[in-house]
Swiss-Prot record:
Induction trigger: Ty1-PR3 is a weakly expressed element. Induced under amino acid starvation conditions by GCN4.
Keyword RNA-binding attributed: yes
Species annotation: Saccharomyces cerevisiae (strain ATCC 204508 / S288c)
Single annotated GO MF: RNA binding
Domain notes: The C-terminal RNA-binding region of CA is sufficient for all its nucleocapsid-like chaperone activities.
UniProt protein name: Transposon Ty1-PR3 Gag polyprotein
Amino acid sequence: MESQQLSNYSPISHGSACASVTSKEVHTNQDPLDVSASKTEECEKASTKANSQQTTTPASSAVPENPHHASPQPASVPPPQNGPYPQQCMMTQNQANPSGWSFYGHPSMIPYTPYQMSPMYFPPGPQSQFPQYPSSVGTPLSTPSPESGNTFTDSSSADSDMTSTKKYVRPPPMLTSPNDFPNWVKTYIKFLQNSNLGGIIPTVNGKPVRQITDDELTFLYNTFQIFAPSQFLPTWVKDILSVDYTDIMKILSKSIEKMQSDTQEANDIVTLANLQYNGSTPADAFETKVTNIIDRLNNNGIHINNKVACQLIMRGLSGEYKFLRYTRHRHLNMTVAELFLDIHAIYEEQQGSRNSKPNYRRNLSDEKNDSRSYTNTTKPKVIARNPQKTNNSKSKTARAHNVSTSNNSPSTDNDSISKSTTEPIQLNNKHDLHLRPGTY
């Protein structure tokens, strides 16, 4: 009778089986919840005894057959959902299954290796024994991090600071789209810095500050695998992982290069939108600068067609080049090369005019100086002639006497007459001489 009650009311747990001693069904009208405490204790003892027999009985021992008793069979226990690797090592290539990555998209199915410098970051679960972050995992990328002010300062002190880890380090959000990967990797790098792993992050030249250890590489691989599901990775990331599924450092290095390229793209767009040209620099240098910017943007996936490029160039023209806005802006099929032909023509014309007119092209200040020098130069001419007069001419009375004698003596030689006429004649009114007839 006791065995029949055990078969009806005893619980089954964790691989232990309590089977009935008879194959006949026992029908009873007793309430299954109305069980005495003594019977419950007996059932628990029987269950404990069955568990102990399961663990102590070797696998090769023979179990006697009993037609009225079912032999206990150990139930297949699934592997722990959140437990780390037993050997504390990385997943092998066969376990990771790099071709299909069957476990990759399910963080709860991945064994997570603990890391001594950082806390564990498991998805929330009822049996987890590590710090949980239910409000952080899967949050949007725009959510600010509480430890945003804590940055990695000195990588050399990472070895001496093995035990002084922050109590709570916010993990990165879950990646939900390939387009969000550039923003996600920034938060992942911030997460590594807050976990005292800033020294292993590649710098601008692509090399880390210090060499990464095996444990750090394991931590890097597991965290990247958990928070970046494979279906949301960009194509270039999948290409890297298809060659080496643990090469997370190469992904970080390429991501930093792309960040720098994005910064260069932004600078090129700003430069192209704020172009200025007035002929002060050679047209060849201006053309080279603009074409290099357009080529870089086109190579990075930002396509600048001829119409947009010509509009941006013409908007920055000034001076004699400004009229190109109004002469060519209606040409729909104008190319950048055609626009620069016009710019070169104006620049060469400017250079030719400057080289051919260097002497008579004067400023207003030069003209003022020339006018002042002209008034002063006329006076020395007058002054230069006065000494010549005083030295070469006689007194006024002598010259007047010579004139009177020359008029009264017709027999004078022609040479003396011609000589006297060439000299300047000055008359004095005291001799009562008048040159104009009819004035006396």
